Amino acid sequence: MRNKFCALLVMVYVLSFVGFAEALTLRLAGQNPVAHQNSVQMENFKKIIEEKTGGKIKVKTYPAGQLGDYALIYEEVSKGTIDMALITIPPKFDQKQQIYFTPYLVSSWHELYKLFDPNGWMYKKVSGFHDKMDIKFLGFFMDGFGGLGLTKEASKPLDPKVPKNVLCRIPNNDVAKLTMTSMGYRTVSVPYADLYTALQTGVAEGWYGGAAVHSYLGFRDVVKYYYPMNIYTELEQWLINKKTWDGLSPSDQKLIESTVAEINKNAVKIAEQEEIMYQKKLAEAGIKVVKITPEQLKPTVDYVRKMVWPKLDKVLGKELTQELIGEYAKK
């Protein structure tokens, strides 16, 4: 009788863990509107993981900043109160995270495919940044390039030495300020959540960053001009809390990594197609989309690199800046 009772306890214990595994839910937070590819691919990730684990792992998605802006989401992933995220990385916890805003690391789609290779320099550096925050870095999701959405026309936008007479919103980071100042713009820092109102009321006359899709989905009612300046790589990152990650089986870890890798592999191609599509949509909405060829852009690229890159050591530190310049200066 005692043996039967012990066997029953063992069975209950085992079944409780099976039940726990079946009930595991990963909370995945994002920042962009539901129509944005970022949010679409969060749903794709959810579908793949749930199907391939037979429902053992479920994914609950929270797009469009439902759990807060990207700075808050990042902090909560670090704490473990949110399991996963696909977000922009705030620099408030580590100034070196501003490396993503380095202007003109690359300036063409062909170069963009190579920039964030999983075996490359940038990928390894970024992994180290997140390790310090108890976060596992899973990969880059490429949105394309950051352009300029303005409510008024810029003066000679392709001559960085000419004052543009536009007050442009930037995020609260030093690299963005260095970049826009070098291009002749006055700047004001406004939280992204308040950007629409700032553009509407004239607190800002434009905004730095965002591909055509962002200006269309979020600001087409207020911007009047879109300049595809390809200033920096517009991207988000897949993250998972380290404790959550360590609690997964090796096979589940492999599945998550491979799923993210496959999604990211297709992201640049989709972003390139969407840039064309959303530039067209912007034009159809009455916004002037300024066409810029690589040849026309090159003087700006060369000038901004010359003016901004050497100053990055004040933000990124001398060692990291020298590594960055050595890695990308000739590309």
Locations of the language-model features?
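Positively charged n-region of N-terminal signal peptides that target proteins for export
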Residues: 1-4
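Bacterial N-terminal signal peptides
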Residues: 7-17
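N-terminal secretory/targeting leader peptides
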Residues: 22-111, 123, 130-131, 136-331
